[in-house]
Amino acid sequence: MILTSESVTEGHPDKLCDQISDAILDGVICKDKNARAGIETIAGNGVVHVFGEVSNPDSVDIPGIIRKTILDIGYTSEDAGIDGNTCSIQESITSQSKEIADAVNFSLEYRNQQGDLGRNSFSQQGSGDQGSVFGYACRETPEMMPLPITIAHKLAYSLAFVRKEKILPYLLPDGKSQVTLGYDSANRPKTLETVVISAQHEDSVDLDKLRFDILERVVRPVISATGLDCSKATFLINPAGRFVTGGPSADSGLTGRKIVVDTYGCAAKHGGGALSGKDPSKLDRFASYMARWVAKHVVAADFAESIEVQISYAIGKAHPVAFNIDTHGTSTIALDKLKCAILKVFDFRPAAVIDSLDLKRPIYQKTAAYGHFGRDIFTWERICPDKLNALLGAV
């Protein structure tokens, strides 16, 4: 089996937009932890346009947040792709629809007087939308992430690191990585097949020097730690040639266009909804994190070598309408028994998820580059001993 996954640097135009959307979201949550927001960003040709819905749009300095985000990434000149100091900023922010707000605030169960409906009941809040999400975990890395996307993220992060630390001072913010691995008959990663790096750079740098420097300073340190067989690997560094014009001046950016980069690469399914710019009442956010949290606990309990968790919701309903798991033939117990144990131990109602994972905090800009999963700075990446013991006991 061959598996390929890609990542992008924080200066990629789409990732720039993800970070702007989530930086604004963090600012909104700082002012009101119960705020509702759905923020989209477009960037291109020296213009940044943010639009969407926010429950308290006047509470934050949106232009100031946008400029700081752009500058912190490293876009300080139009020659690099955009200048955070001088770019044009346009806003089209409105309040959330009352109908949507009511559906979230007063669930179908609450309106029909079903279930536990006491004060502050988790059944009162409904899902902010319909849809399905997928969570995944496996034994390929200590982080329980697929190895191809893990390596791709490390390469992309390393590109930004050597740029910011001026180890390779001629690099500019835009960049991408891609990793192809070969798997053995037991579906374990075995060989490194191909690495692709595309790095934006200043016009003055020699292309051969750039290729050598990136191979030695970025690629080899990351790859050497994997233990993969690299004897037949192909390394393609800036295979298209020079990459001087980059960032939003070369390709327009848009929030939500790197959803596979954000999750598990090509190793798992994706429900199609983007995460960035959305407050935790949105199912693409709370349910995606919950699905990952559950998947990690199943693998940590040694009930499966890998698992994909699917959760589906209806707008305005607190309880999921469907739940499914796939252990790819690696489960150590019957799937029906495992599924029942998961549903017994974990509460999938939106308010319960938000409470369990402490999601009403300004944590979201950090998620918007180098993956939402695989980093233990996030609550959904941490194994809860009580939940793990309960899961073990439930089977």
From Swiss-Prot:
What is the reaction catalyzed?
L-methionine + ATP + H2O = S-adenosyl-L-methionine + phosphate + diphosphate
Q: In which pathway does it act?
A: Amino-acid biosynthesis; S-adenosyl-L-methionine biosynthesis; S-adenosyl-L-methionine from L-methionine: step 1/1
**Which GO BP terms apply?**
one-carbon metabolic process; S-adenosylmethionine biosynthetic process
Any idea of its EC number?
A: 2.5.1.6
The record's comment on cofactor binding reads: Binds 2 divalent ions per subunit.
Report which superkingdom the organism of origin falls in.
Answer: Bacteria
Q: Which UniProt keywords apply?
A: ATP-binding, Cytoplasm, Magnesium, Metal-binding, Nucleotide-binding, One-carbon metabolism, Potassium, Transferase
Q: Which positions in this protein are listed as binding L-methionine?
A: 53, 96, 251, 282
PROSITE patterns, A to Z: ADOMET_SYNTHASE_1
Kindly give the InterPro entries that the UniProt entry links to this protein.
Answer: ADOMET_SYNTHASE_CS, S-AdoMet_synt_C, S-AdoMet_synt_central, S-AdoMet_synt_N, S-AdoMet_synthetase, S-AdoMet_synthetase_sfam
Family matches, as CDD domains: S-AdoMet_synt (cd18079)
Binding positions for ATP? 12, 174-176, 242-243, 251, 257-258, 274, 278
Where are the stretches annotated Flexible loop?
A: 96-106
Cofactor (UniProt): Mg(2+); K(+)
Q: Give the UniProt entry's GO cellular component terms.
A: cytoplasm
Any one Gene Ontology MF annotation carried by this entry is: methionine adenosyltransferase activity
Q: Where in the cell is it found?
A: Cytoplasm
**What is this protein's function per UniProt?**
Catalyzes the formation of S-adenosylmethionine (AdoMet) from methionine and ATP. The overall synthetic reaction is composed of two sequential steps, AdoMet formation and the subsequent tripolyphosphate hydrolysis which occurs prior to release of AdoMet from the enzyme.
Similarity comment text for this entry: Belongs to the AdoMet synthase family.
Indicate what this protein is called per its UniProt record: S-adenosylmethionine synthase
